[in-house]
Amino acid sequence: MINYDLTQIRAIVFDVDGVLSCSTIPMDSRGEPVRTINIKDGYAIQLAEKHGLRIAIMTGGHNEDIRLRYEYLGVEDVYLSCAVKVRTWEAFKERYGLRDEEIVYVGDDIPDYEVMQLAGRSEEHTSELQSRITI
């Protein structure tokens, strides 16, 4: 078991594709991604909110269905079409008076890397990404 001190964490920010949905995404007839969402993730998000954590979604995806799904779960901060996620990260922090070390970021791809470096905790593949890219 990994033991993290999460006592100062006030928020969790999630990417969507590959994190809250499968990384292999089929397309519909219009070329739009058809995302599958794990019901257990929804329960976990609601539980985290119930315990006072602020939850945010930060995705490069632009489909309004993403917003609807997470607003239905009570997530107020759903950021779509995030081309440069660090800008959205900074705006989110400023809006709620948060510091980097108070936020967990969960991402899995190159657009997440810069934010992962700022976050108090970041998960998923930071070291794997770091070994593959140069920014």
What feature does the model see in each segment?
Residues 123-135:
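Single conserved hydrophobic/aromatic residue that forms the stacking wall/gate
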Residues 45-50, 90-97, 117:
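Surface-exposed amphipathic alpha-helices with a cationic face
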Residues 20-51, 60:
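A positional/architectural concept
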Residues 45-69, 79-80:
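Substrate-recognition element of Asp-dependent hydrolases with the DxDx(T/V) motif
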Residues 89-113:
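Conserved Lys-Pro-Asp/Glu-containing loop-to-beta segment of HAD-superfamily phosphomonoesterases
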Residues 1-16:
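Non-catalytic pre-domain segments flanking phosphatase-related domains
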Residues 59-63, 104-110, 127:
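Glycine-rich beta-to-alpha transition loops that act as phosphate-gripper elements at the mouths
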